[in-house]
């Protein structure tokens, strides 16, 4: 039986990464799941991690940025995601294609049609079974990021950029309610954990 593919999404500072390990641990307790693979985008492969460093720290044309995102994604799908799903393993990814539509599309203003063309080519129909969107007001996200490590290129973007990015995430969630679950990430860590367990138990 083919495995399940779960993605975690949200703007920087939403707190999604805090919960990935806990969800993976809970799923690993289940006897019906051979293994759980946790990964991230951009990244997930040696080439993908190299591209991640370029994407997070180098200035480039917005179309170049999108192309590199999808190049890293193609390698990720071919080398990690598809083989794991074919084995029956479950895959949890910290970001996937929705992030590209939100950041490069919503945030940067790249035409959705161009991103959709790349998505069709690179993914060949692959979509997550479940996308958990961690949503927070920009003020909350900014407070969480303040005083953290040196911000990368995206974390240092303007408030307007993140307003557009968040709006695009929510728009996509509204368009695909069967796949998305929007999490109020202003809740306590414990409240979010309980909510996530309820959602995961339905898979």
From Swiss-Prot:
Q: Which GO cellular component terms, listed alphabetically, does the Swiss-Prot or TrEMBL entry include? A: cytosol
Which InterPro entries does the record match to this protein?
P-loop_NTPase (IPR027417), Thymidylate_kin-like_dom (IPR039430), Thymidylate_kinase (IPR018094)
The processes (GO biological process) annotated in the record are: dTDP biosynthetic process; dTTP biosynthetic process; dUDP biosynthetic process
**What's one GO MF term for it?**
dTMP kinase activity
Q: Does the keyword Transport apply?
A: no
Q: Which domain of life is it from?
A: Bacteria
Q: Which UniProt keywords apply?
A: ATP-binding, Kinase, Nucleotide biosynthesis, Nucleotide-binding, Transferase
| Reactions mediated catalytically | dTMP + ATP = dTDP + ADP
UniProt KW Nucleotide-binding keyword: yes
E.C. number, please?
Answer: 2.7.4.9
Q: Where does ATP bind?
A: 10-17
Return the PANTHER family for the record: THYMIDYLATE KINASE, UMP-CMP KINASE 2, MITOCHONDRIAL
HAMAP family on file: Thymidylate_kinase (MF_00165)
Report the family membership: Belongs to the thymidylate kinase family.
Q: What is this protein called?
A: Thymidylate kinase
* Organism from which the protein derives: Cupriavidus pinatubonensis (strain JMP 134 / LMG 1197)
